[in-house]
């Protein structure tokens, strides 16, 4: 309670349980560290990426819904083919469902940043990338103040951020290489 260092704290007031080593939860303040391998690639990510690619090439391909439903089945939630049969074969509706599935399934895994840029929709409602990031008021002295929704960070998004800058050393190596717009 008297520690004002703010070391090892959440800036937003929210703590993430996903991916946590559950063996450490009940070991008090000083749990013994246990190795837990980090995920580099997840099968669900590949299934959803493949469904997205199939949808762009051939929206009528039955594997699109099968791959999305494989992810949903593993999570124990209703299958798209059962709850939204009307989207099957419709490119736009399937794309919307795949994007939604990626947002939920891959939450806090660092994929959203790249998805939104790949889809080039960072300025659209529901996908916006710039602006304030909200959380709890971590400077509050009481519970009521803590529960107040507070902006703790402001992020910037510019159109040029859809593409990365090409390193100057690479541009200098090639006479035909041109810097990406805005950089």
Residue ranges, per PLM feature:
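Acidic/polar-rich alpha-helix caps and helix-coil junctions
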Residues: 1-183
């Amino acid at each position: 309670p008297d520690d004002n260092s703010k070391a090892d704290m959440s800036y937003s007031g929210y703590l993430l349980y996903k991916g946590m080593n559950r063996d450490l939860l009940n070991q008090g303040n000083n749990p013994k560290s246990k190795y837990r391998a980090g995920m580099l690639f997840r099968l669900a990510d590949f299934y959803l990426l493949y469904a997205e690619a199939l949808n762009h090439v051939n929206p009528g391909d039955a594997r699109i819904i099968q791959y999305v439903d494989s992810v949903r089945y593993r999570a124990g939630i209703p299958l798209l083919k059962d709850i939204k049969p009307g989207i099957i074969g419709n490119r736009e509706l399937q794309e919307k469902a795949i994007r939604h599935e990626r947002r939920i399934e891959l939450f806090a895994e660092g994929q959203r940043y790249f998805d939104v840029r790949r889809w080039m929709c960072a300025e659209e409602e529901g996908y916006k990338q710039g602006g304030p990031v909200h959380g709890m008021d971590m400077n509050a002295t009481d519970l009521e103040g803590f529960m107040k929704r507070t902006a703790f960070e402001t992020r910037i998004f510019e159109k040029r951020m859809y593409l990365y800058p090409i390193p100057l050393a690479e541009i200098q190596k090639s006479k035909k290489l041109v810097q990406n717009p805005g950089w």
